[in-house]
Amino acid sequence: MSAERLLLSEKYKAFLRCDAPVEFLEGTTAAGKTTVGLFKFMLKVAESSKKLHIIAAKDTGTAEKNIINKDLGIVDDFGVLVEYNGNGTKDDKIPHILFHASGGDKVIYVMGYGDKKKWQKALGGQYGCLYIDEINTADIDFVREAAMRCDYLMATLNPDDPSLDVYKEYINCSRPLPEWEDETPQEIKEELKEEPKPGWVHWFFSFAHNLGLPKEKLDKILANTPKGTKIWKNKILGLRGK
């Protein structure tokens, strides 16, 4: 267990309390989106009536590094309640997390959306909760296939090229909650213009919402990112653009 603690700003507290079928967490780098998002995702899994769930990242190695084994990741947060089987088991060959929830064991499959043959083989049936890491980089066919099979969808992203299909088909159909609308950059609000889907929520998070980010770390991130570049616009300002 790491010495770090999950520190929650008022906006993240509101996020944890929010009950929505689909939630998109867009914003700057180091905003805490993955850290707090994963904690909520696991609570949603525990509440779900379904046994099978999915976590998707570019590949299983990325999922292990950024989601499962990171400080304040799934293993750190839930300890003995989770068992990660990175190579599957003799009964279930797909990499998965076994989550000993109060209502019974849950199986969370860990999938890489970067390998189409693999995810096509693994994806089938219906699932409770779906978490997609960096959905802006995901294969849109995976997003379409997986999203239609789940009861609850959470996805994280740093802003990217607004012409990506995932924006038009998914993210731009969500809206910020009225009480947090003013914290969403005007540029992004103007992009959220597709027909809204009932209950779909868009969350914008920035450095200011990550109470666990030390000032020295933030200063280093800012110093090491060249101004005027795409990466500065997307990851530091939290704005979309090529």
Language-model features: locations:
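Phosphate/NTP-binding elements of NTP-utilizing enzymes
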Residues: 1-242
